[in-house]
Amino acid sequence: MCGRFELKTKFEKLPKVLKQDYPSGLDSKYETQNLIRPNDPVLVIKNEGRIKTTFMTWGFISPWAKDPFSKERPRPFNARSETVEEKKLFSASWKHKRCLIPASGFFEKKYRVRKANYETFWLGGIWSKWTSPDGVELESCCVLTTEPNDLIKPLHPVSYTHLTLPTTLVV
């Protein structure tokens, strides 16, 4: 499971698609992130009629949540690609709200996994928009995971049944 990742890419080296339609001030306030944890803000590309760069909370909040910050209902930060379409929590986002999350590495147990050339890659994800009774909107996302490939399997003991690999994409 991908529970930590990093984005150590400097702003000028980020993929061009991230810099086409981004939040005001991102270029001057952007900082690399050495350790991104669930509930942290993450940089995301989404498509709602046009490709847009934005920040979202990493940890999926359902649109029908009464309290998005409740400690009683943890927010999933991963969704298994094999079952995401079947899960009520994720099915609408799977159909209509997919996203890409830039990363330069992710962590599995005590290992850091990155590209050999240190380039940015993409984690596939889904996102959701929660709206408060007052009309305040909060966007959140989670990373899609899949069965681990032969490079990642050795990073966990055989008894570890939850092992999944973030869905990485080449764009």
Locate predicted features.
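A contiguous catalytic/ligand-binding core that recognizes phosphate-bearing ligands
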Residues: 81-135
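Residues immediately flanking
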Residues: 103-106, 146-148, 165
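Conserved small/polar residues in nucleotide/adenosyl-binding loops
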Residues: 161-167
